[in-house]
Amino acid sequence: MEEDSLYLGGEWQFNHFSKLTSSRPDAAFAEIQRTSLPEKSPLSCETRVDLCDDLAPVARQLAPREKLPLSNRRPAAVGAGLQNMGNTCYVNASLQCLTYTPPLANYMLSREHSQTCHRHKGCMLCTMQAHITRALHNPGHVIQPSQALAAGFHRGKQEDAHEFLMFTVDAMKKACLPGHKQVDHHSKDTTLIHQIFGGYWRSQIKCLHCHGISDTFDPYLDIALDIQAAQSVQQALEQLVKPEELNGENAYHCGVCLQRAPASKMLTLLTSAKVLILVLKRFSDVTGNKIAKNVQYPECLDMQPYMSQPNTGPLVYVLYAVLVHAGWSCHNGHYFSYVKAQEGQWYKMDDAEVTASSITSVLSQQAYVLFYIQKSEWERHSESVSRGREPRALGAEDTDRRATQGELKRDHPCLQAPELDEHLVERATQESTLDHWKFLQEQNKTKPEFNVRKVEGTLPPDVLVIHQSKYKCGMKNHHPEQQSSLLNLSSSTPTHQESMNTGTLASLRGRARRSKGKNKHSKRALLVCQ
């Protein structure tokens, strides 16, 4: 992994005698010695943020929070399925969760980045913009993810989905900094990606001898939860912020009274992200074996009890995506995900197969990674749908939007590049050949321990399969009457209205004929269950 990705990054430290373990050992920090303070007079959350801003002089040049384009641009319906190119289910499951992250999707659909970035090749933001745009605007199709999305990560075998997820998030974060390569770590933590996924921990140690307080602030992009002794996400969070007593051999060397004395240590959230990525630690760091236990997680999660300022009212998050692993090790088995489309319907995204699901099914999974968004943000997106506002076309003229983009361009790191022509933007969506991936897959392919396509062999009686994967062995065994009702959606297929008028479904025989038209996508079969 990249050294400044994943869990804790660079730190802001107050009284440097207390220091959290950081994945960036070279991170710079500020030191402020604080003498004994009254118990009820800690720095306020706002004061801490102001101090942090002072440590990041170019922060407002990277991605101003007040100018983050979060207006709704997403289509209401579910988008495309993703083709499995050989042991890439972990890639597909992670990409679907990111695709249905509202703030990220809205920013990508605005094409703000591609209009100002001059390094399309090797830029993860440009690559993700092309992928999200294609996925959301091609419902009923199966698309192939670009090789560039997993370049430098995929080695022809299955990898850990959470590691790939954070690899991608970290690469997007770095893509925000091409014009500010010399900025300090604090400024890097103000990028657009950090504004969406990032927040700050506060680790506070209080000396019980002189009552001196030492605070350390660390940025995060995701939160790892120990589930060994937890039955729910709330219990895991409570354990994470539970005060720890430091005494005896673990006594604290106070930087205020300069004595070795008993102390209390508490880890809390100074600021919480717009989008929370909660990873349940299901795999052993040594053996990779899985902790296969049910851990309850809610549809709505109040994060206020885990904040540094716990008495300021509810801070409610709503679930919008779940990444699931089926199997016994992080290096085998199968990954898939559940996502919540803008209209509020849940869907199971299993490679090429997109199936309507229910919240009951979503909440009954052995989840690996949970995605929550602040309720106020989700309701704002849902409100635009309920009012019947259709998403604007990508090239639509909008005075307010253009004004906002103009303000952002003056502060964005990729500002000096000329605006791209349409064919240059389209070029970013083109994919190179997959021969290299297939070659690596054949050379390194290991025989699976079980048939990963039979993870869920049965379908609920009221399920609606929007499009069907090529892996139909499980359905043939459990739903032969449904398998026989597949609609042939080749290039000669009648229109949707004609099919509904006739009321008949043709049997799918053989593979669908490839379309010869430019930029055509293969159609998917439609399965209707009574």
Swiss-Prot record:
Leading EC class: hydrolase
Bias (Basic and acidic residues): 382-392, 398-412
One of the record's GO molecular function terms: cysteine-type deubiquitinase activity
Catalytic activity: Thiol-dependent hydrolysis of ester, thioester, amide, peptide and isopeptide bonds formed by the C-terminal Gly of ubiquitin (a 76-residue protein attached to proteins as an intracellular targeting signal)
Polar residues biased stretches: 493-505
Composition bias type Basic residues, residue spans: 510-524
Entries under SUPFAM superfamilies matching the protein: Cysteine proteinases
Any Pfam family: HABP4_PAI-RBP1
InterPro entries: HABP4_PAIRBP1-bd, Papain-like_cys_pep_sf, Peptidase_C19, Peptidase_C19_UCH, USP_CS, USP_dom
Domain USP: start-end pairs: 80-375
Principal location: nucleus
Region annotation Disordered: where it falls in the sequence: 382-412, 477-530
GO terms for cellular component: cytosol; endoplasmic reticulum; nucleus
Subcellular location: Nucleus; Endoplasmic reticulum
EC number: 3.4.19.12
Source superkingdom: Eukaryota
Entry keyword rRNA-binding: no
Family: Belongs to the peptidase C19 family. USP17 subfamily.
Main function: Deubiquitinating enzyme that removes conjugated ubiquitin from specific proteins to regulate different cellular processes that may include cell proliferation, progression through the cell cycle, apoptosis, cell migration, and the cellular response to viral infection.
Protein's recorded name: Ubiquitin carboxyl-terminal hydrolase 17-like protein 21
Species annotation: Homo sapiens (Human)
Gene giving rise to this polypeptide: USP17L21
